[in-house]
Amino acid sequence: MKAEQQHTPMMQQYLRLKAENPDILLFYRMGDFYELFYDDAKKASQLLDISLTKRGASAGEPIPMAGVPFHAVEGYLAKLVQLGESVAICEQVGDPATSKGPVERKVVRIVTPGTVTDEALLSERLDNLIAAIYHHNGKFGYATLDVTSGRFQLVEPQSEEAMAAELQRTSPRELLFPEDFEPVHLMTGRNGNRRRPVWEFELETAKQQLNQQFGTKDLVGFGVENAMLGLCAAGCLIQYVKDTQRTALPHIRALTYDRQDDSVILDAATRRNLELTQNLAGGSDNTLAAVLDRCATPMGSRMLKRWIHQPMRCITTREHRLDAIAELKEQALFSDIHPVVKQIGDIERILARLALRSARPRDLARLRHAMQQLPELAQTLSSLGNSHLKSLATAAAPMDDVCELLERAIKENPPVVIRDGGVIAEGYSADLDEWRDLADGATGYLEKLEEEERDRHGIDTLKVGYNNVHGFYIQVSRGQSHLVPPHYVRRQTLKNAERYIIPELKEHEDKVLNSKSKALAIEKQLWEELFDLLLPHLARLQELAAAVAQLDVLQNLAERADTLDYCRPNLTKDPVVHITAGRHPVVEQVTSDPFIANPIELNSQRKMLIITGPNMGGKSTYMRQTALIALMAHIGSYVPAESATIGSIDRIFTRIGASDDLASGRSTFMVEMTETANILHNATANSLVLMDEIGRGTSTYDGLSLAWASAHWLATQIGAMTLFATHYFELTELPNQLPHLANVHLDAVEHGDSIAFMHAVQEGAASKSYGLAVAGLAGVPKTVIKNARQKLSQLELLSAEGSQPKARTVDIANQLSLIPEPSEVEQALASIDPDDLTPRQALEALYRLKKML
């Protein structure tokens, strides 16, 4: 006997469905619950903190079981999706009344972290991306898809560093990778990684899948036909999404090539250090996005974050945005646009659910409400003169046909789901209205029947009622049940009453129930037909949503510029960063003290600033604010300064702060050096580089040597615009030795045992570091500070005398190297081939080697 045949028919059905979905949790509908069995039950009980019970037996052992109520399933799904789990939803599709054996069930949808579209499972102000990654010969193909909007992009990073930066930028909720993927360390620490068969990434299969999706013969029109690695990833991705959604994907209409040359490249360390959308603790407070995002709609908020993470190099695009912001700011139109756009809401995600035919009645009611706001938006935008805003206003023009259809079709306040009807408005369908009238007319008939029966038999407690179990009934109190005539048939006995049925009432019940079920069937059919009527408008609706989202971002940036006193940056192609009275956009909002604004000047004659000054003096803030102002200028935003001229930047690098990477076995110093190596290899003359405290993780001489050499290389070989903060005062000599360098410092003033930080940037090098004063502020015991001052005096005296402490002599030139470099003699010996030498040449070589010793 097969193992499956040892189970009940219901469990046999479960095992067949589970075999089709072996790697994900299966929610198996049984009545009012979704049940899980075996290992799924054990896993779900731990993840969801629900009870683990038992049911029946398998091979003599009870079957583990856990369940969740169907009406509360969204909350449990949300928790599982947040944990990176995927769930197959199995529903009863057969009719229990006509089924022989178990009710027919099938998996109707698969919920995965990257493909969810339900509002309850999504963060409304964050993109929800699914991605696929492919690797070949050291290069990568990477595709991302936002199922909730239809945005489908691919990119081809040329190195692991670039690939890591893309993963950091996009933060996919789900990541597909082939079974033979080698650089698996890229996925360390990520939830939602999915291993897929290698054949799903085959190029020809991918092209076939994509052409089928877009209804095209080739991909030339999308400009991606030569992106072979990216297409391999995109093909796997579209197939996976089709498999999980179990439906067509009409809202995914194009695949775009995200060319990295078009944007300012930010590596993973830079995104982390600048705290763009996530702070160093992993939260969203005190980030650039937290300050800039006052968007009226979630879709506007998501677009703004995409802009922040992908600054544009194209000056024309940025000038268009700045021109639009200028007009909205000067005319204070943002205050008029904000409330109207807020009423439009997040139609982008509603349209995705419409495309997937998973939209609910209230989705379409919200879409109707959004359509009703468009005439007012058009009126508000009618006075605009800016060409970019005019084009957005045209794209967001009213769609009267869609609005009229939704107004006719959907009730004012529809229920949450279509299941029980009551969604389609009166007057939309004469057929539906007729059956509804028949069902609703029952109320008057029942009231009349109740009154007649009560008068006819003299039973004043007689009532006509209805429940789902027994249908219609006549109820009489126990005290008057003796008055009931013989043709009353008892249906139910209660504690204080009896319930009866009569032929006339039974006949009416059959008629009413039939009319209700008929009306519900017609309503569900009309609901499906409504999708068919709306889908031809999908492309136009998506364009409208994108235009409204961009209007929202622009009005938001105009409001921020006005409220926070930002200025319009002057954009130029020259490598220059000239800022007057610049401020850190985040720090100035969270500090209780007045923020000290500072200038900066970087240009072709002043490429590097050596920044010195005390800890807590503001060096890191000064560096970060420069990078953030440059980044804001590259998204087309106003900036926190009195004035700013920002040149075209190709990359922003930061080497600020570090911590041990314990998972990879890398020390603080190793992390620091890895980031430094990345900068020295990839920076160009058009890059903005922030280097903070290079070399602090090792000995003084090692650190000083590395800091000096790094600064020297950046200045002489690369010529990048560089802010180089250091505690090594020896580096302040560099501007005296090399052109295009300058010293600046942040100062402090000591008052006895206290210290006041000025936070003002001044020309020249700092005179001292104030390290002991900072230690005192931190609470280091005064005795320790006193001993430190004595030791400092001794060291300064020895340094002035030109000697080293006798306790330990450091031979700088002969430090132990992890990879010993060959001596001059060894190099000379290695270059000699004895078999090719005459006796005379051999003797001459020996004398040369002797001289080298």
Curated annotation (Swiss-Prot):
One GO location term (cellular component): cytosol
One Pfam family cited in the UniProt record for this chain: MutS_III
Keyword Nucleotide-binding: yes
UniProt xrefs under InterPro entries: DNA_mismatch_repair_MutS, DNA_mismatch_repair_MutS-lik_N, DNA_mismatch_repair_MutS/MSH, DNA_mismatch_repair_MutS_C, DNA_mismatch_repair_MutS_clamp, DNA_mismatch_repair_MutS_core, DNA_mismatch_repair_MutS_N, DNA_mismatch_repair_MutS_sf
BP GO annotations: mismatch repair
SUPFAM superfamilies xref list: DNA repair protein MutS, domain I, DNA repair protein MutS, domain II, DNA repair protein MutS, domain III, P-loop containing nucleoside triphosphate hydrolases
UniProt GO MF annotations: ATP binding; ATP-dependent DNA damage sensor activity; damaged DNA binding; mismatched DNA binding
Residues annotated to bind ATP: 613-620
Keywords associated with the record: ATP-binding, DNA damage, DNA repair, DNA-binding, Nucleotide-binding
Superkingdom of origin organism: Bacteria
Family label: Belongs to the DNA mismatch repair MutS family.
Chain's role: This protein is involved in the repair of mismatches in DNA. It is possible that it carries out the mismatch recognition step. This protein has a weak ATPase activity.
NCBIfam families noted in UniProt: mutS1 (TIGR01070), PRK05399.1 (NF003810)
Record-given protein name: DNA mismatch repair protein MutS
Organism: Vibrio vulnificus (strain YJ016)
Gene name of the encoded protein: mutS
